[in-house]
Amino acid sequence: MRKFILGLLLLSLTSTAVARDIYVDNRNGDDRRSGRTPTADGEASGPVRTIEKAIRLCGGGGDRIILINSGEPYREQVSIQGPRCSGTAEQPFELIGNGCVLDGRVPLEEAPWEHYRGEIFRVQPKYMSFQQVFLGETPAVRRYSTDGLVPELKPLEWCLLDGYIYFRPEPGRLPESYDLYCCGAKTGITLYNVHDVVISDLVVRGFHLDGVNAHDNVRRTDIIGVNSSANGRSGFSVGGASRVRIEDCAAAGNGAAQVRTEGFSILQLNGGNFDPASAPALVQEGGRVVTRNPAGR
């Protein structure tokens, strides 16, 4: 009996000890390193370069992935799923953004633009159902078709119709002469089959579908202080049987909704700023939304 109790104690201590910090630096990191320190110390010690590698290094039990803000956007999709990315009520798995930008855009500078009519050009992007167009770092002004035809576009305006991006440059210029981008990656952060997760202090933009998508079976998960804007469909999407809290977050300029729910999900929405100028602040295609602020997670 004494050995059994001792074994349980050792197991408890081991499960606590395995939780660790993994650092990511997309400028100075290297995926051959351990990720255990924020700066390089020799060939093996130092931050990794990608969030994908950091997730592969996770072992469950409440690891923390800490992004170093290098000033350069992180250009990757993040998939948080399964036991290795789950924590406990006392020690959640964390993705700490430190104000970093997760960017899903691709340049249109060398895209195969074709002349449509007048001063309007068009191009067919990889993802055609939802899109955004950016002039440099700023979303371009979008127009919508009301009759199935390309609307009248003023210079530097665009629309999405029948799988094409239509864009009108300024007189005497071609689309290739602009610093144009569109959505080139599907979803910024996908959560699936995880529990006890905290995602904080990130900017997510330029993804074809959603900035953050809690797809299914996501439990006891908090999204805190995340700005998810200018994505093709929505800033935040909660679906399936997920239970998620979104707290002090922001969303603007998304294509179909700032926040959307579906399935049998329950979303707790605490504070935040969800600008309805481009699309409704909340679209419910199923699920339930509560706005109370309970003491527990």
Model-derived segments and spans:
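Positively charged n-region of N-terminal signal peptides that target proteins for export
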Residues: 1-4
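Sec-dependent N-terminal signal peptides
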Residues: 6-8
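Boundary at the C-terminal end of the N-terminal hydrophobic targeting segment
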Residues: 17-19
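Extracellular polysaccharide-degrading/modifying enzymes targeting complex plant/algal/animal polysaccharides
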Residues: 23-206, 213-214, 237
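Glycine-rich beta-solenoid repeat tracts in large extracellular/virion proteins
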Residues: 77-83, 87, 100-105, 187-193, ...
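All-beta strand scaffolds that present successive hydrophobic residues in beta-strands
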Residues: 94-97, 197-200, 218-225, 244-249, ...
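Beta-strand-rich solenoid/repeat architectures in extracellular/passenger domains
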Residues: 101-103, 173-185, 200-207, 226-231, ...
